[in-house]
Amino acid sequence: MLNRFFRFFISSLVSLFCVANVFAEPVLQRLSNGGSLVIAHRESSIPFSYLDSNKKPVGYALDLCLKIAEAVQKKLALKKMPIEFLQVTPANRIPMIEAGKADLECGSTTNNAERREKVAFTIPHFITGARLLVLSNSKIERIEDMFGKTLV
């Protein structure tokens, strides 16, 4: 079942990359002409995107992006497709995609309305929720217990 989910996930991502986004056409044309796929990555967003001890980009999100690259290469019937890595920061990752300096950003970027106005997102591959922690001897047991208190 996991294999079926993974195939569905990858095919969905490839569909988004190849079809849904009008801006993908110049990228696909460049790749067809022998150009490189530029994958943006983070330096230390463990476990999603980080540099290993050899300064090689690795991580869960990188693995997914490399699977997307394989699928795009297959879809375009390319014998080889060069891949370049571009290290980005939280401050420049969206601008690098907007400027066309990177084709995919493989990290832990949160999908929100403001960012969706600038770039397209795939289906989520990680979902999290906010948690609150207090000392075990605190009198705070519910969210309502924090009303009127100063929070940092």
Predicted features along the sequence, with ranges:
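Short, well-ordered beta-strand segments
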Residues: 38-40, 133, 149-152
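Phosphate-coordination loops involved in phosphoryl transfer and adenosine-cofactor binding
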Residues: 34-36, 140, 147-149
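Acidic, polar ligand-binding/catalytic clefts
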Residues: 66, 78-145
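Bacterial N-terminal signal peptides that target proteins for export
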Residues: 1-13
